[in-house]
Amino acid sequence: MSQTIKAVMFMSGAIVSFSAMAVAGRAISFELDTFEIMMYRSIVGICVVLILGRMFGTLGQITKRNLGTHFIRNISHFAGQNLWFYAITVVPLAQVFALEFTSPLWVLLLSPLLLNERWTQMRVLAGVMGFVGILIVTRPTGQSVNIGVIAAALSAIGFAGSAIFTKRLTRTETITCILFYLTVMQLAFGVICAGYDGDIAMPSLDTLPWLVLIGFAGLLAHFCLTTALSLAPATVVMPVDFIRLPVIAMVGMLVYAEAIDMWVFIGAAIIFTGNYMNIWSETRKA
C-alpha cells in the first residue's frame, strides 16, 4: 500500500471525527459558549494524551525545541476552531463545511512558501475543481452573506495555517508531542478567553457525554490529520477533506432536517473527481 493511500485512509478517519464533533458541538452550543467548549474539550484531550502516552511509553518524546512553531500552529487552530464552532450554531452544516473547505486552497497557495512544496498542474486542478464545487454548493449571494458565513470562511484560513505548521512539525516532532502541545495550549487559550468576563459556566450532566465525545473526536481527528500529513504532502492530504461536505450534508438532513438539494451532490461530485484525479496522479509517482 502506497504512502498516499495510507494518508487518504487516515484523512477518512479525520472526516468521520470532525463530523461527529460538529454534531456534538451543536448539541451543547445552547449551554456553553465556544470558548468554554474549547476549554472543556482540551481538558478531555490532555487526559487522553497523558493516559495513552503513559501506556505506550511515548511521553518522553515531548520536547521543547519547537515551542514557537507549536504556539503559532495552535493560535491559528484556536482561532479557526472557535470561528467554526460559532458558525455551526447559526449556519446550516453543509454551508459551514463548504466554506471551511476553502482551507485546502489556502494550503495550496501557502505550502510552496512555507513548506517548500511545489505546485503541480494536477494539484492546482484539484484545488480549482474543489473551489468550483464549493461555489456550486453554496451559491453565495448578497443576501446570504452574514456573520455566520463570514466566521465559517475565516475559520478556513485558521485551519490552513494549522495544517501547514502541523506539516512542518511532523518533520521533527512525534505525534504524541504535537498532540500534547495542542491540548495544553488550547486549554490555556480557552481558560483565558472563557474567563475574561469572570464567568465560566460549568457543564451539566446532560452535556458531559457530548463534551467527552468532542474531546475524543477532536483528538482522533488531529491524530488522523497529523499522521496523514506525515505520510504525504499537504497539497495532497488537505483536498481529500472536501469529501466531508456531502457527508455532513447528509448528517444535517437526517439529524437536523436541514434542506438539501441536487446542487450539493453536483458540487460534491466535482470535488470528489478533483480529489480522485489528484490521488491517482500522486499514486502513480509513488
Which residues does each PLM region occupy?
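Membrane-interface interhelical linkers
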Residues: M1-V16, I46-I72, Q121, E173, ...
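Juxtamembrane helix-entry segments on the extracytoplasmic side of multipass membrane proteins
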Residues: Q3-A7, T34, M39, I62-N66, ...
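Hydrophobic/small/kink-forming positions within alpha-helical transmembrane segments
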Residues: I15-V23, L50, N74-N82, P104-L109, ...
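Transmembrane alpha-helical segments that form core, pore/gating elements
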Residues: V23-R26, V49, Q143-P203
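Helix-loop interface residues and adjacent transmembrane-helix termini in multi-pass membrane transporters
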Residues: E31, A87-V90, N116-R118, T172, ...
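C-terminal transmembrane-helix exit sites in multi-pass transporters
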Residues: Y86, S103-L125, P246-F265
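Helix-helix packing/entry segments at the starts of transmembrane helices
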Residues: V96-T102, L169-M185, H222-M253
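Hydrophobic transmembrane alpha-helices of multi-pass small-molecule transport proteins
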Residues: M122-T138, W263-E282
